Amino acid sequence: MELVDAICSNPHARSVVEYCLTPCFRLSYSTLFKAVAEMTWDETALAHVVAPYLSQPQERPFKLLGVDVTPQPRQYAHTLADRGMIYQPNMVKGNKPITIGHQYSTVALLPEVEEGVSSSWIVPLLSRRAHTDEDKELVGAEQMDTLLKDNRLPFGHALCAEVGDTSYSKPAYLHANRHHGNLVTIARARGTRTFYRQYVATSEESEAGHPTWYGGAFSLKDETTRPEPDETIIVTERSRRGKVYRVEIKAWHNMLMRGKYKPKRLPMHRYPFSLVQAVRYDEQGALACQRPLWLIVVGERRHELNLSDIYHAYHQRFDLEHFFRFGKQKLLLAGFQTPEGVREENWWQLVHLAYAQLWMARHVAHNLPRPWERNLPSMKTCRTSPSLVQRNFGRIVRQIGTPAKPPKPRGNSPGRRKGTKLTPRPRQKVLVKNQQPAKPA
């Protein structure tokens, strides 16, 4: 408990061990690592903790969930098992954006915007490491299935929409949770893909032979293959800088994509979807973005979401990116250095719990700007952000107290005997997917 409070109230820690210097952490630094090592945490424990505090959506008829994967670079942890090649942005031009480490999949609730509260908040629900022999998107599908089939959580019967980036638009992920009738998946599609309209048979055709499922091709990069849209709306939005944009949203219903046959057959012709295109224009009528936004909307109840809901739901997906950035910079989400994979996973669970505690304290935090921040527009609007709550959390802990019992000294540990030599840990190989064995000369 005190470790979670220390994470929530110390935004200046540069390493995990510095959390023991936080006033609310009354134990020794060795206890910090012992707590992480001995921690036992069920996968759905965090979701059950925050479930009583989740409010019902008021402005939209569905609960919005987000799923994404973020890297944990560990290129120097040579004794850490199951390291693989992962994505990592690289600022040096010409270098490949990869490094060595782990990947973690997070599922979170994307709540509606509250008055006086920053729009970047999320509510983390599940976090799990994607092993090198697993598909990281299908790990997210398993997490989503865990949420929806848990009767103690409010997601099993309510209409839920999940949003994901382009990696979640592949057939394997879209097919994974179609047995949940209350789930609608919104995923971005690459602009080079080709989909198909449903085939409409004529009365003159024979019914003999294999049924025809796919009609004419619909190429996202070829406008000549697109028929007239089934639905079109125009919405207006204003940026933070005050610029006004006009967004034209079109939809083609009952589209199909081809499935896969390996490693197992995916009958995607059974799951028609709506294809949504969003094009953004500035005040002069010129294109504000070079390329249009293409979205796939699949699910039995997809027609209960209008085009405006779909467009704004996908844009809220970027709050997950804000969470990962804040977690790694202010909560040391990727800062725990250990050769034990289980302890690393425990630390990720602890940081997700700490962020959830910051979210629950958002309404009792005071706005405490620094002297040079008092005249900033963001401070004048008094929108409580995760950084402001973390800056104020020490006062909250001192005011309401902590349920943790005060520590009691138990004597001095004998420690290691003089002359003890520890066996060096074996070095682990870096696992590379699809690595072909070397051919004999």
PLM region descriptions:
Residues E2-A6, T106-A108, V351-Y355:
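Contiguous, well-ordered alpha-helical segments that form the cores/surfaces of helical PPI scaffolds
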Residues P23, D68-P71, P111, T166-Y168, ...:
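Short, flexible loop/turn elements at secondary-structure junctions
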Residues A35-S119, P124-S127, K264:
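Active-site-proximal, Lys/Arg-enriched surface segment
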Residues T22, P52-Y53, T146-N151:
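A generic secondary-structure signal
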Residues M1-M39, A45, V50:
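Gly/serine-rich nucleotide phosphate-binding loop at the start of the catalytic core
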Residues H12, H78, G116-A441:
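Single, function-defining residue in the core of a domain
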